[in-house]
Amino acid sequence: MSPIKHKTIRMIKDKIFLFIVGALTLLAILPLFHIIISIVEKGLPIIMERGLTFITGTLSEGGIGPAIVGTLMLTFLATLIGLPLAFLAGAYAYEFPNSFIGRATKMLLQIMLEFPTILVGTFVMGMLVVPMGTFSALAGALALALILTPYVAVYTEEAMAEVPKIYKEGGYALGCTRAQVIFKVITKMAKKGILTGILIGMAKVAGETAPLLFTAGGLYEVYPTNPLEPVGAIPLLIYTLVQSPSIEDHQMAWGAALVMLIIFLAIFVPIRYALKDDIKL
């Protein structure tokens, strides 16, 4: 076979391969675009019809204001509760990978990643809701914190493991303690991976419904102010609305879904952009 013919065959194979990969990639992302388009198409009319009332009003007024505030409150509290534990667990798994506790920590985190979230809700219900005698934002946040923890911890451990060992050795050579090396050297070098894990964890808990059924309670007529009282959330409200036979409630559910999508994009896209190499945090 001549070199020219061999090169031609190779180019044809490359183009076929690229075409197949491109087609499969398009096939994989089509459902995502379909979901986004459906949410915008069905959710935008109800928002345009009711205007600001849909964003700020209570459920009886035709709005989802308390649910929006409840989602933000639950996500913030869950991050506040779960982030320190998750970071420390990830750092410990990185620093002591071969110890019994280190291996047990990694195994437990992997199990928690796949653990049914509804069981987390029932666990927190028995531990906190039943003794308190009421649903509360605190109980919902605790359930969400347990869900957030493994995501942040695993990403933290993996991000730290990718830092070249020369930086760790350099820290020890300068006389730094183990804690100083981990928190001031390794963490700084791995900050993008750690922040990515935090974002993924926050996105996960902000969209959770199952654990909130047993913990948060759902409250949509007043804005939440006390973490010890019941609270609503957008995913929980959507779940409630879609069970109704009313077409108007279904339209509200689509509008709530669009609002939640906008909140996600408004928060996470700028932060993801800030994680690029050319922008310093």
Curated annotation (Swiss-Prot):
In the record, biological process GO terms are:
phosphate ion transmembrane transport
Please provide, in alphabetical order, the Gene Ontology terms of the cellular component aspect for this entry: plasma membrane
Q: Which UniProt keywords apply?
A: Cell membrane, Membrane, Phosphate transport, Transmembrane, Transmembrane helix, Transport
Transmembrane segments annotated in the record for this chain: 16-36, 68-88, 107-127, 128-148, 194-214, 251-271
Location of the protein in the cell: Cell membrane
Q: One GO MF term, please? A: phosphate transmembrane transporter activity
- Coiled coil location: none
Task: Please give the superkingdom of this protein's source.
Answer: Archaea
Supply the CDD domains for this chain. Answer: TM_PBP2
InterPro entries recorded? MetI-like, MetI-like_sf, Phosphate_PstA, Phosphate_transprt_permease
* Residues in ABC transmembrane type-1 domain copies: 68-271
How does this protein sit in the membrane?
Answer: Multi-pass membrane protein
Q: Give a single Pfam family match.
A: BPD_transp_1
Q: What does this protein do?
A: Part of the binding-protein-dependent transport system for phosphate; probably responsible for the translocation of the substrate across the membrane.
Stated family: Belongs to the binding-protein-dependent transport system permease family. CysTW subfamily.
What protein name applies here?
Answer: Probable phosphate transport system permease protein PstA
What organism is the protein native to?
Methanocaldococcus jannaschii (strain ATCC 43067 / DSM 2661 / JAL-1 / JCM 10045 / NBRC 100440) (Methanococcus jannaschii)
